[in-house]
């Protein structure tokens, strides 16, 4: 596992403790991180770089190795009980995970850890093997705590300490956006020369425009409806309640809209909402809009692309977001986005061109923005064109090229070299 100094990487050890890359994104802890790990690995393999993805064996009788595609394997590491566990319990199995990873055969050039839990493992493995550690955080506890102070879903002190240790140990840090890079430096004291910004991508072959009426027919949606779509994990941080309350205000202000409006939520409960998976449906009933709301489980990407095409608007009202992959996927399908003006969404959405960014988290403000778009079909048409143009700049090939440059920098320069 000794790095080939002065050359591009030939083999990468990728670590994903939090969630398996084989899991269906959109529920539990599976989300954009899963998509990122899988899509970058596939494209690394296309360039001739082999990728081994190490993840926890979270179910009984899993095969030790699963081939994801030619050049990419997923290695299941026994660590803790062979079942899904609350992520709050995962720090207790990191020692077992680290030991299992160190026993695995392989000569790797670089370790790339995703999420702070993986980083705790990655720091030990990289140091033991004499190879550089590249770290992607995907979320930051201090940022989350600023918007969810003291609430369920906020980051505990042990997580903040763990994040700080990982950030200090990493040879290179990959930020999804300039905003995340600034947060790493300002909040965690990361050395600026070790922070590299690499925007995630989307599969532009899969997420592309299609016939809206056909998509709606496949999904059982009225062809003439005004469809608002929330896609992703259903948790407070993602703000599904904001969209639900905004929709209720729209309907109560215009009863005629009840015949046209469909509010769809595609995703599974995550975080604090896993204890009450029906909470979203209950909220719709309490607000008197149960007939207009449709709640669907997470679905494979081809079906998700149909949901994006079927939607009039995709709404991403996150209270915090390091990037917002859903927003770019939707725009790649030609659907404008109404999103919170937070974090990476300010990069994922081009305000006034591909969608609308909303300041604050007041449902009334979202209702106002959506109502204005309902009343202005010409603007919606312009935003559709802008969405396609903006999303075209987020293919995976550029992201992978930039990641490979980060790896080369880490291999050749070592710690502290830009």
From Swiss-Prot:
Any one GO biological process: mycothiol biosynthetic process
Positions bound to 1D-myo-inositol 3-phosphate: 29-34, 87, 115, 139, 159
Keywords, in A-Z order: Glycosyltransferase, Magnesium, Metal-binding, Transferase
Domain of life: Bacteria
Positions of Mg(2+) binding: 308-309, 311, 335
Binding-site residues for UDP-N-acetyl-alpha-D-glucosamine, renumbered to this chain: 24-25, 32, 233, 238, 321, 329
GO terms assigned for molecular function: acetylglucosaminyltransferase activity; D-inositol-3-phosphate glycosyltransferase activity; magnesium ion binding
Keyword Glycosyltransferase: yes
The enzyme's E.C. designation: 2.4.1.250
Catalytic activity reported: 1D-myo-inositol 3-phosphate + UDP-N-acetyl-alpha-D-glucosamine = 1D-myo-inositol 2-acetamido-2-deoxy-alpha-D-glucopyranoside 3-phosphate + UDP + H(+)
Protein family: Belongs to the glycosyltransferase group 1 family. MshA subfamily.
Subunit-structure text: Homodimer.
Described purpose of this protein according to its UniProt entry: Catalyzes the transfer of a N-acetyl-glucosamine moiety to 1D-myo-inositol 3-phosphate to produce 1D-myo-inositol 2-acetamido-2-deoxy-glucopyranoside 3-phosphate in the mycothiol biosynthesis pathway.
The protein, known as: D-inositol 3-phosphate glycosyltransferase 1
Gene: mshA1
